Amino acid sequence: MACVLACVAVLIGAASATASIDFTPIDDGAGLVFERIGALRHVTNQRFLFVQTIDYYPLLQELAKISKFVREPRNNASSCPLVKLVRPGKPRATGGRISKHLASLTQINKEFVSYTLNSADPQNNEVFTDVLEVDYEDTRQQDAAFADAHNPPHWSVVSAADVKELLAVAPPRDRVRVLPHISTANVADKYLKYEACINEERSADNECLYLTEMHGVMASKLADAASFANTLDRLIKQTRRNKLNMTNNVIDDELLLREMRQLSKLLAGHGLGWVVDFERELNAQFDLSQAYKLHLYASQNTVVLCVAMPLVDTAALQYSLYKVATVPFCRGTMCLMMVPAADYIAVTDTRNFYTQVPADFQTQCKAFAGYDEFLCPASQRVPTLDSGECEIEMFMGRYARDIDVQCDMRVADNRPSQVLLGPLVNCRKWVYSFSSNATVSYWCGARDAATVAVPAGVGVVVAQSPLTCSVRVNKDALLFTVDTRSHKAASRAYWPRRRFNYNDYVNTSLLLQTTTSFADTVTDLSAQQLKTLRSRFHIRDYATPRHTFFAPRRSDAAAPDPPHEKPTMLVYVLLGVGVLSALCVVGAYCAFRRYCKQRRSSVVVSFKNDDSQPMVAISNGARAGVHINVPHNNSAPKYEKAFLFPMEIKRTNNKLA
């Protein structure tokens, strides 16, 4: 928290001196602020493996042959002045370097035989001053092992047993891509014919010429061997840093991207896809290594590099990730704090669904700067409608009358010189609350040092450009430093259309009249710190003037009694019952009148079945009867049996009973 405090103080102090710092007051009645820090996508437990193997056994054998050759007495070239000799210790040093690296890797086979230098060998007394130690440099300062120290995601875990199994059988094409095998045998094979030729021509007359050619060949082999040794050395270091580049001469991110593009259609047929969208534009911070996980094993003298790549469900929803922070509402000696249950929430852009964000978000999710998003383990989607969660209801702009029951609202002491800070984006953006005017002294180099006054209130401070500073706040003896040079992704605040406001719920004059000797103090606005507050706040205690003294309610106190009904409520109920009764009486009268009309206007229809279709005319007049008009058609045939004709009824007035 010291870093955050320093960062905010530095940025506030520099606000008046540079345009790169933005100091903006906000409404202190908002309760919570939501900062969108990026997108969030779920990765499945399924993964895709790229496997690269390099066999070092032929190279170790060849180095042993070279060492034996230069030690044989008959190959002594001391009498040949033009021969550029190969030092006897060089092949052994290169072989020892490779063997040492192989021994440091986890073996997938228990029967591995280690190649080591025999220190008891009386001939092994050279000092290898010509051994080249490669110091591989990488821009990353952290070892990737630390990033996955806490329960790595399932897709990234590749054990030695997994590697042994996929090498033993043909792996499925939609889950594993075995890259072309690399063998070190070529180091010796490309010189076989040439060596055979000069060995046949060797004689006492051309001994020096023979040794000159052979030492030249061995020097070339040792150069190739050193290159393979460097490859192994850099693969080990790049695996630790979880970042491939072409300095290993084997595989890098560009090669992986080409392979991934070719496999996209194959994965799409299974409803899966890469975390990389090849139809989408990448930003300047794109780094594929932020998505994959490297594993390096050994199978006897063969190095096995595994690149685990997560897969996403093509039908899965994409979310926006928000940091949730408390906005203090301070009046008098009291500060109301709405404590969020979670530091982060993830909501779809349509705001129809949300999902839980892991508590250990920083370790469970991987930041993927290429799309300004985070890759997290899959979790269930939940409708935002009637979620019952304080953060979601506040995000949606739905505020219940009993908001203090739905949300965890607590009371903190408001000291006269209180300075509270809550991070929104680490060392770049914060919520601040100053109970009084603050004096900030900062030093950002010889050309940027000043003392500025920051007014009291609540707001958000943002660093628009990188800064490295040290600062003192209110002449305190504490010295803080900040470095925001590594931040590149943009973030923005989200406010619901209907913003929450404490003033709609609380009579602030009552807060100003209340003393809070019972309230706890806090040093920052983090959720962990705010949850230590023991006093909960109930709105009804400050909604109307009270005739008794304020009594704080502790977190372990019993639930408050339900409020009493007001007398006006009974009047509204009686009026509603009266209106409903009147409507029922009117409806019954209309129904009875309609029934009487139907009785007076009823008509009986009868006709005689004839050979022709009858036409029935009905009239509801007082003297009108029923007339059945039968068409006279003498040519129609007579039927001896009764025949059922369809009846057509014709209206003669506007009513038909």
UniProtKB/Swiss-Prot annotation:
- Return the protein name: Uncharacterized 73.1 kDa protein
For this UniProt record, give its keywords in alphabetical order, as a comma-separated list: Signal
Report any Pfam family annotated for this entry.
Baculo_F
Lineage: superkingdom? Viruses
Q: Which residues form the signal peptide?
A: 1-17
Q: Which InterPro entries does the entry mention? A: Envelope_fusion-like (IPR022048)
Q: Does the keyword Signal apply?
A: yes
